[in-house]
Protein backbone atom coordinates (compact mmCIF):
# COMPACT_ATOMS: atom_id res chain seq x y z
CA UNK A 1 0.00 0.00 0.00
CA UNK A 2 1.42 3.36 -1.05
CA UNK A 3 1.28 6.48 1.06
CA UNK A 4 -2.02 8.32 0.64
CA UNK A 5 -1.87 10.66 -2.33
CA UNK A 6 -2.37 14.36 -1.66
CA UNK A 7 -5.36 16.06 -3.24
CA UNK A 8 -4.58 18.03 -6.36
CA UNK A 9 -5.83 21.52 -7.17
CA UNK A 10 -5.43 24.27 -9.73
CA UNK A 11 -3.04 27.14 -9.11
CA UNK A 12 -3.08 29.49 -12.09
CA UNK A 13 -1.81 27.61 -15.14
CA UNK A 14 -0.48 24.75 -13.02
CA UNK A 15 -1.85 21.74 -11.20
CA UNK A 16 -0.31 21.47 -7.74
CA UNK A 17 -0.52 19.20 -4.71
CA UNK A 18 -1.49 20.20 -1.20
CA UNK A 19 2.07 21.38 -0.51
CA UNK A 20 1.93 23.66 -3.54
CA UNK A 21 4.36 21.58 -5.60
CA UNK A 22 3.58 21.43 -9.34
CA UNK A 23 2.27 18.09 -10.65
CA UNK A 24 2.15 17.53 -14.40
CA UNK A 25 -0.13 14.57 -14.96
CA UNK A 26 1.28 11.98 -17.38
CA UNK A 27 -0.27 8.62 -18.13
CA UNK A 28 -2.57 6.53 -20.31
CA UNK A 29 -6.26 5.98 -20.99
CA UNK A 30 -8.03 2.75 -20.14
CA UNK A 31 -10.00 2.95 -23.37
CA UNK A 32 -12.40 0.18 -24.35
CA UNK A 33 -12.96 -1.17 -20.84
CA UNK A 34 -15.96 0.54 -19.25
CA UNK A 35 -16.97 2.06 -22.59
CA UNK A 36 -16.52 -0.57 -25.28
CA UNK A 37 -15.43 0.49 -28.78
CA UNK A 38 -15.52 -1.77 -31.82
CA UNK A 39 -12.14 -1.06 -33.40
CA UNK A 40 -10.36 -1.75 -30.12
CA UNK A 41 -11.61 -5.35 -30.39
CA UNK A 42 -10.96 -5.50 -34.17
CA UNK A 43 -14.62 -4.91 -34.92
CA UNK A 44 -16.78 -2.39 -36.73
CA UNK A 45 -17.41 0.90 -34.98
CA UNK A 46 -21.03 0.39 -34.05
CA UNK A 47 -22.37 1.76 -30.75
CA UNK A 48 -21.77 -0.37 -27.67
CA UNK A 49 -25.51 -0.59 -27.12
CA UNK A 50 -25.99 -1.92 -30.67
CA UNK A 51 -23.45 -4.66 -30.06
CA UNK A 52 -25.13 -5.59 -26.78
CA UNK A 53 -28.60 -5.56 -28.33
CA UNK A 54 -27.39 -8.01 -30.98
CA UNK A 55 -25.72 -10.20 -28.37
CA UNK A 56 -28.85 -10.27 -26.20
CA UNK A 57 -31.08 -11.01 -29.19
CA UNK A 58 -28.90 -14.01 -30.05
CA UNK A 59 -28.26 -15.46 -26.58
CA UNK A 60 -30.57 -13.77 -24.09
CA UNK A 61 -30.25 -11.35 -21.17
CA UNK A 62 -28.51 -13.77 -18.82
CA UNK A 63 -25.77 -14.53 -21.36
CA UNK A 64 -25.25 -10.81 -22.02
CA UNK A 65 -24.85 -10.12 -18.32
CA UNK A 66 -22.39 -13.00 -18.06
CA UNK A 67 -20.41 -11.66 -21.02
CA UNK A 68 -20.37 -8.08 -19.72
CA UNK A 69 -19.23 -9.15 -16.27
CA UNK A 70 -16.55 -11.44 -17.69
CA UNK A 71 -15.18 -8.75 -20.01
CA UNK A 72 -15.04 -6.07 -17.32
CA UNK A 73 -13.44 -8.46 -14.84
CA UNK A 74 -10.72 -9.47 -17.30
CA UNK A 75 -9.85 -6.69 -19.75
CA UNK A 76 -8.48 -4.48 -16.95
CA UNK A 77 -7.34 -6.03 -13.66
CA UNK A 78 -5.39 -4.91 -10.63
CA UNK A 79 -2.18 -6.08 -12.32
CA UNK A 80 -2.71 -3.49 -15.06
CA UNK A 81 -2.80 -0.60 -12.60
CA UNK A 82 0.35 -1.92 -10.97
CA UNK A 83 2.01 -2.15 -14.40
CA UNK A 84 1.13 1.42 -15.37
CA UNK A 85 2.47 2.67 -12.06
CA UNK A 86 5.71 0.71 -12.63
CA UNK A 87 6.17 2.55 -15.93
CA UNK A 88 6.53 5.80 -14.01
CA UNK A 89 3.13 7.20 -14.99
CA UNK A 90 1.27 9.23 -12.38
CA UNK A 91 -2.22 9.29 -13.92
CA UNK A 92 -4.83 7.05 -15.55
CA UNK A 93 -7.86 8.39 -17.41
CA UNK A 94 -10.86 6.09 -17.05
CA UNK A 95 -13.49 6.49 -19.79
CA UNK A 96 -16.91 5.16 -18.85
CA UNK A 97 -20.36 4.94 -20.37
CA UNK A 98 -23.10 6.57 -18.30
CA UNK A 99 -24.96 3.28 -18.76
CA UNK A 100 -22.33 1.74 -16.49
CA UNK A 101 -23.95 3.45 -13.52
CA UNK A 102 -27.52 4.16 -14.67
CA UNK A 103 -29.96 1.74 -16.25
CA UNK A 104 -31.02 3.30 -19.56
CA UNK A 105 -34.62 2.19 -19.16
CA UNK A 106 -34.73 3.37 -15.53
CA UNK A 107 -33.74 7.06 -15.50
CA UNK A 108 -32.16 8.29 -12.26
CA UNK A 109 -31.59 4.70 -11.16
CA UNK A 110 -28.29 3.34 -9.84
CA UNK A 111 -26.57 0.32 -11.37
CA UNK A 112 -24.62 -0.85 -8.34
CA UNK A 113 -23.00 -3.67 -10.30
CA UNK A 114 -21.56 -1.16 -12.78
CA UNK A 115 -20.53 1.30 -10.09
CA UNK A 116 -18.52 -1.47 -8.49
CA UNK A 117 -16.04 -1.29 -11.38
CA UNK A 118 -15.42 2.42 -10.97
CA UNK A 119 -15.03 1.92 -7.22
CA UNK A 120 -12.61 -0.92 -7.83
CA UNK A 121 -10.52 1.17 -10.24
CA UNK A 122 -10.31 4.05 -7.77
CA UNK A 123 -9.36 1.63 -4.98
CA UNK A 124 -6.56 0.17 -7.12
CA UNK A 125 -5.27 3.65 -7.89
CA UNK A 126 -5.25 4.44 -4.18
CA UNK A 127 -3.42 1.19 -3.46
CA UNK A 128 -0.65 1.82 -5.99
CA UNK A 129 -0.35 5.57 -5.55
CA UNK A 130 -1.47 6.75 -8.98
CA UNK A 131 -4.06 9.40 -9.81
CA UNK A 132 -7.12 8.76 -11.96
CA UNK A 133 -9.42 11.03 -13.93
CA UNK A 134 -13.03 9.89 -14.30
CA UNK A 135 -14.18 10.58 -17.87
CA UNK A 136 -17.84 10.40 -18.85
CA UNK A 137 -17.24 9.16 -22.38
CA UNK A 138 -20.91 8.69 -23.26
CA UNK A 139 -23.58 10.89 -21.66
CA UNK A 140 -27.38 10.52 -21.61
CA UNK A 141 -28.66 11.33 -25.09
CA UNK A 142 -25.08 11.51 -26.43
CA UNK A 143 -22.91 14.63 -26.64
CA UNK A 144 -21.60 14.00 -30.16
CA UNK A 145 -22.68 11.89 -33.18
CA UNK A 146 -19.84 9.36 -32.84
CA UNK A 147 -20.10 5.68 -32.00
CA UNK A 148 -17.91 6.41 -28.97
CA UNK A 149 -20.73 8.40 -27.39
CA UNK A 150 -22.81 5.22 -27.80
CA UNK A 151 -25.33 6.63 -30.25
CA UNK A 152 -26.54 6.09 -33.80
CA UNK A 153 -25.36 9.44 -35.12
CA UNK A 154 -27.77 11.85 -33.42
CA UNK A 155 -26.75 13.57 -30.21
CA UNK A 156 -29.63 14.55 -27.95
CA UNK A 157 -27.96 15.75 -24.78
CA UNK A 158 -27.99 19.49 -25.41
CA UNK A 159 -31.46 19.63 -26.96
CA UNK A 160 -33.28 17.53 -24.38
CA UNK A 161 -33.89 18.84 -20.86
CA UNK A 162 -34.61 15.38 -19.51
CA UNK A 163 -31.24 14.09 -20.72
CA UNK A 164 -29.51 17.12 -19.24
CA UNK A 165 -31.19 16.48 -15.89
CA UNK A 166 -30.00 12.86 -15.95
CA UNK A 167 -26.48 13.98 -16.82
CA UNK A 168 -26.36 16.55 -14.02
CA UNK A 169 -27.80 14.11 -11.48
CA UNK A 170 -25.12 11.56 -12.38
CA UNK A 171 -22.32 14.04 -11.73
CA UNK A 172 -23.88 15.05 -8.43
CA UNK A 173 -23.93 11.38 -7.44
CA UNK A 174 -20.34 10.74 -8.58
CA UNK A 175 -19.09 13.80 -6.71
CA UNK A 176 -20.75 12.52 -3.54
CA UNK A 177 -19.26 9.08 -4.16
CA UNK A 178 -15.63 10.19 -4.61
CA UNK A 179 -15.38 13.48 -2.72
CA UNK A 180 -13.03 12.00 -0.12
CA UNK A 181 -10.80 10.05 -2.52
CA UNK A 182 -7.51 11.84 -3.08
CA UNK A 183 -6.53 9.32 -5.77
CA UNK A 184 -9.15 10.93 -8.00
CA UNK A 185 -7.37 13.85 -9.66
CA UNK A 186 -10.67 15.13 -10.96
CA UNK A 187 -13.72 14.76 -13.13
CA UNK A 188 -13.59 14.98 -16.94
CA UNK A 189 -17.25 15.80 -17.16
CA UNK A 190 -17.97 15.38 -20.90
CA UNK A 191 -15.89 13.71 -23.58
CA UNK A 192 -15.58 15.43 -26.97
CA UNK A 193 -18.79 17.48 -27.12
CA UNK A 194 -19.91 18.65 -30.56
CA UNK A 195 -22.21 21.63 -31.09
CA UNK A 196 -22.66 24.10 -33.96
CA UNK A 197 -20.23 26.98 -33.49
CA UNK A 198 -23.23 29.30 -33.33
CA UNK A 199 -24.55 27.44 -30.28
CA UNK A 200 -21.41 27.03 -28.18
CA UNK A 201 -23.06 28.97 -25.36
CA UNK A 202 -25.15 25.85 -24.69
CA UNK A 203 -22.00 23.93 -23.81
CA UNK A 204 -20.80 26.56 -21.38
CA UNK A 205 -24.26 26.72 -19.82
CA UNK A 206 -24.25 22.96 -19.25
CA UNK A 207 -20.75 23.14 -17.77
CA UNK A 208 -21.83 25.87 -15.35
CA UNK A 209 -24.70 23.67 -14.18
CA UNK A 210 -22.51 20.57 -13.91
CA UNK A 211 -19.94 22.51 -11.91
CA UNK A 212 -22.63 23.65 -9.49
CA UNK A 213 -23.89 20.09 -9.01
CA UNK A 214 -20.38 18.84 -8.35
CA UNK A 215 -19.42 21.70 -6.06
CA UNK A 216 -22.56 21.27 -3.96
CA UNK A 217 -21.12 17.87 -3.02
CA UNK A 218 -17.36 18.14 -3.56
CA UNK A 219 -15.17 21.23 -3.25
CA UNK A 220 -11.83 19.38 -3.47
CA UNK A 221 -11.47 17.84 -6.91
CA UNK A 222 -10.44 19.43 -10.18
CA UNK A 223 -13.14 19.75 -12.82
CA UNK A 224 -11.82 19.12 -16.34
CA UNK A 225 -13.83 20.78 -19.12
CA UNK A 226 -13.36 19.83 -22.77
CA UNK A 227 -13.75 22.28 -25.62
CA UNK A 228 -16.33 22.08 -28.37
CA UNK A 229 -15.76 20.20 -31.63
CA UNK A 230 -14.10 17.04 -30.34
CA UNK A 231 -12.29 18.85 -27.49
CA UNK A 232 -10.52 21.37 -29.69
CA UNK A 233 -12.30 24.75 -29.45
CA UNK A 234 -11.80 26.46 -26.10
CA UNK A 235 -12.43 30.11 -26.96
CA UNK A 236 -16.13 30.12 -26.06
CA UNK A 237 -15.39 28.78 -22.57
CA UNK A 238 -13.35 31.83 -21.56
CA UNK A 239 -12.05 32.10 -18.02
CA UNK A 240 -13.47 29.34 -15.80
CA UNK A 241 -16.02 30.48 -13.25
CA UNK A 242 -14.80 27.89 -10.75
CA UNK A 243 -11.16 28.40 -9.72
CA UNK A 244 -10.42 24.68 -9.41
CA UNK A 245 -11.00 24.01 -13.10
CA UNK A 246 -8.69 22.83 -15.89
CA UNK A 247 -9.42 22.67 -19.61
CA UNK A 248 -8.91 19.54 -21.69
CA UNK A 249 -8.09 19.19 -25.38
CA UNK A 250 -7.53 16.22 -27.70
CA UNK A 251 -5.46 15.87 -30.87
CA UNK A 252 -4.98 13.24 -33.53
CA UNK A 253 -3.52 15.55 -36.17
CA UNK A 254 -3.00 14.83 -38.99
CA UNK A 255 -5.96 12.49 -38.79
CA UNK A 256 -5.30 10.41 -41.90
CA UNK A 257 -1.78 9.68 -40.62
CA UNK A 258 -2.58 8.89 -36.98
CA UNK A 259 -5.53 6.69 -37.96
CA UNK A 260 -3.77 5.16 -41.00
CA UNK A 261 -6.71 6.09 -43.20
CA UNK A 262 -4.51 7.04 -46.14
CA UNK A 263 -1.74 4.68 -47.18
CA UNK A 264 1.76 6.06 -47.61
CA UNK A 265 1.71 9.02 -45.24
CA UNK A 266 4.85 9.60 -43.21
CA UNK A 267 5.78 11.77 -40.24
CA UNK A 268 7.41 14.21 -40.64
CA UNK A 269 5.72 14.62 -43.98
CA UNK A 270 2.94 16.09 -46.05
CA UNK A 271 -0.79 15.60 -45.47
CA UNK A 272 -3.62 17.82 -46.76
CA UNK A 273 -0.93 19.84 -48.66
CA UNK A 274 0.67 20.80 -45.33
CA UNK A 275 4.03 19.75 -43.93
CA UNK A 276 3.53 18.14 -40.52
CA UNK A 277 6.54 18.22 -38.21
CA UNK A 278 7.50 19.39 -34.75
CA UNK A 279 7.70 22.98 -35.90
CA UNK A 280 4.06 22.83 -37.01
CA UNK A 281 2.92 21.38 -33.70
CA UNK A 282 4.85 24.09 -31.85
CA UNK A 283 2.98 26.65 -33.97
CA UNK A 284 -0.38 24.98 -33.27
CA UNK A 285 0.37 24.96 -29.54
CA UNK A 286 0.92 28.73 -29.37
CA UNK A 287 -2.77 29.76 -29.34
CA UNK A 288 -3.47 27.21 -26.62
CA UNK A 289 -0.53 28.51 -24.58
CA UNK A 290 -1.82 32.07 -24.99
CA UNK A 291 -5.29 30.91 -23.95
CA UNK A 292 -3.82 29.24 -20.84
CA UNK A 293 -2.00 32.37 -19.79
CA UNK A 294 -4.78 34.81 -20.66
CA UNK A 295 -7.40 32.82 -18.75
CA UNK A 296 -5.07 31.58 -16.00
CA UNK A 297 -6.03 27.92 -16.44
CA UNK A 298 -4.07 24.65 -16.87
CA UNK A 299 -4.34 22.54 -20.01
CA UNK A 300 -4.58 18.77 -20.14
CA UNK A 301 -4.22 16.72 -23.33
CA UNK A 302 -6.69 13.99 -22.48
CA UNK A 303 -6.22 12.03 -25.70
CA UNK A 304 -3.61 11.69 -28.41
CA UNK A 305 -2.52 8.51 -30.14
CA UNK A 306 -1.43 6.89 -33.37
CA UNK A 307 -1.87 3.65 -35.28
CA UNK A 308 1.28 1.53 -34.85
CA UNK A 309 3.11 0.41 -37.97
CA UNK A 310 6.28 -0.81 -36.24
CA UNK A 311 7.76 2.66 -36.41
CA UNK A 312 8.27 2.49 -40.18
CA UNK A 313 6.18 5.57 -40.96
CA UNK A 314 7.38 7.90 -38.21
CA UNK A 315 4.58 7.24 -35.75
CA UNK A 316 7.00 6.93 -32.81
CA UNK A 317 8.61 10.22 -33.83
CA UNK A 318 5.12 11.75 -33.85
CA UNK A 319 4.61 10.70 -30.22
CA UNK A 320 8.08 11.92 -29.28
CA UNK A 321 7.43 15.36 -30.78
CA UNK A 322 4.02 15.56 -29.11
CA UNK A 323 5.53 14.88 -25.69
CA UNK A 324 8.20 17.50 -26.29
CA UNK A 325 5.58 20.13 -27.16
CA UNK A 326 3.53 19.20 -24.08
CA UNK A 327 6.61 19.54 -21.88
CA UNK A 328 7.57 22.92 -23.31
CA UNK A 329 4.06 24.24 -22.69
CA UNK A 330 3.42 22.66 -19.28
CA UNK A 331 0.56 20.50 -20.58
CA UNK A 332 -0.52 17.35 -18.71
CA UNK A 333 -1.33 14.33 -20.87
CA UNK A 334 -2.73 10.80 -21.13
CA UNK A 335 -1.98 8.64 -24.17
CA UNK A 336 -4.78 6.89 -26.06
CA UNK A 337 -4.66 4.06 -25.20
CA UNK A 338 -3.34 1.31 -22.89
CA UNK A 339 -4.38 -1.82 -24.84
CA UNK A 340 -6.20 -2.84 -28.01
CA UNK A 341 -6.52 -5.73 -30.37
CA UNK A 342 -4.04 -4.74 -33.11
CA UNK A 343 -5.87 -3.12 -36.00
CA UNK A 344 -5.01 -1.75 -39.41
CA UNK A 345 -6.56 1.62 -38.61
CA UNK A 346 -7.30 3.84 -35.61
CA UNK A 347 -4.92 4.47 -32.68
CA UNK A 348 -3.35 1.36 -31.17
CA UNK A 349 -2.66 0.45 -27.58
CA UNK A 350 0.72 0.37 -25.91
CA UNK A 351 -0.19 -3.29 -25.53
CA UNK A 352 -1.56 -5.01 -28.67
CA UNK A 353 -3.21 -8.37 -29.17
CA UNK A 354 -1.57 -9.84 -32.27
CA UNK A 355 -3.14 -13.32 -32.48
CA UNK A 356 -5.98 -14.25 -34.80
CA UNK A 357 -8.39 -16.64 -33.04
CA UNK A 358 -11.95 -17.09 -34.35
CA UNK A 359 -13.24 -14.14 -32.26
CA UNK A 360 -10.80 -11.79 -34.02
CA UNK A 361 -10.98 -13.41 -37.47
CA UNK A 362 -8.99 -10.76 -39.33
CA UNK A 363 -9.78 -12.35 -42.70
CA UNK A 364 -13.53 -11.71 -42.25
CA UNK A 365 -16.12 -11.33 -43.52
CA UNK A 366 -17.47 -11.24 -39.94
CA UNK A 367 -14.77 -10.16 -37.52
CA UNK A 368 -14.08 -8.77 -34.09
CA UNK A 369 -16.81 -8.30 -31.55
CA UNK A 370 -19.56 -9.20 -34.01
CA UNK A 371 -18.35 -12.80 -33.81
CA UNK A 372 -18.81 -12.89 -30.04
CA UNK A 373 -22.46 -13.93 -29.86
CA UNK A 374 -21.99 -16.93 -32.14
CA UNK A 375 -18.78 -18.05 -30.41
CA UNK A 376 -19.57 -17.32 -26.76
CA UNK A 377 -21.32 -20.63 -25.95
CA UNK A 378 -18.37 -22.79 -27.04
CA UNK A 379 -15.37 -20.41 -26.84
CA UNK A 380 -16.19 -18.51 -23.66
CA UNK A 381 -13.20 -19.71 -21.64
CA UNK A 382 -10.64 -19.05 -24.37
CA UNK A 383 -12.15 -15.66 -25.17
CA UNK A 384 -12.01 -14.54 -21.55
CA UNK A 385 -8.41 -15.69 -21.18
CA UNK A 386 -7.40 -13.87 -24.37
CA UNK A 387 -8.51 -10.52 -22.91
CA UNK A 388 -5.87 -10.67 -20.16
CA UNK A 389 -2.98 -8.28 -20.80
CA UNK A 390 -0.44 -11.08 -20.45
CA UNK A 391 -1.64 -12.25 -23.87
CA UNK A 392 -0.99 -8.84 -25.43
CA UNK A 393 2.39 -7.74 -26.81
CA UNK A 394 4.11 -4.57 -25.63
CA UNK A 395 4.91 -2.08 -28.39
CA UNK A 396 8.48 -1.58 -27.22
CA UNK A 397 9.28 1.38 -29.45
CA UNK A 398 6.21 3.30 -28.34
CA UNK A 399 6.69 2.28 -24.73
CA UNK A 400 10.29 3.55 -24.72
CA UNK A 401 9.15 7.03 -25.78
CA UNK A 402 6.30 7.11 -23.25
CA UNK A 403 8.54 5.84 -20.45
CA UNK A 404 10.98 8.66 -21.15
CA UNK A 405 8.10 11.12 -20.98
CA UNK A 406 6.86 9.66 -17.70
CA UNK A 407 10.35 10.05 -16.20
CA UNK A 408 10.72 13.75 -17.03
CA UNK A 409 10.79 15.86 -13.89
CA UNK A 410 9.34 18.98 -15.47
Question: Model segments located where?
Answer:
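Substrate-binding cleft and catalytic face of glycoside hydrolase catalytic domains
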Residues: 56-61, 73-178, 183, 191-192
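N-terminal carbohydrate-binding accessory modules
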Residues: 1-89, 405
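Glycan-binding loop/region signatures in secreted carbohydrate-active enzymes
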Residues: 30-73, 248, 253-285, 291-292, ...
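Alpha-helix-centered segments that form part of catalytic cores
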Residues: 60-89, 276-287, 299, 381, ...
Amino acid sequence: MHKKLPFLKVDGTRIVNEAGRPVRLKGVNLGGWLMMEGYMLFGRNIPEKAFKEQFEKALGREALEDFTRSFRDTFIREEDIRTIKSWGANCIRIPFNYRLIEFEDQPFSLNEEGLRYLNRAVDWCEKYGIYCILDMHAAPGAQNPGWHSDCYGHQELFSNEFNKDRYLRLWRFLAEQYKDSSAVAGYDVLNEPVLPFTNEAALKDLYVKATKEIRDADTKHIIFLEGNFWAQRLASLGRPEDPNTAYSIHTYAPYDFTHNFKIGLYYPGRAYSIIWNKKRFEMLAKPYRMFMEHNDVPLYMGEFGVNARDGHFGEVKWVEDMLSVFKDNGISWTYWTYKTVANYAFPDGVYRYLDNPPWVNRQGPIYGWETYASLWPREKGRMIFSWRTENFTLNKKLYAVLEKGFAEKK
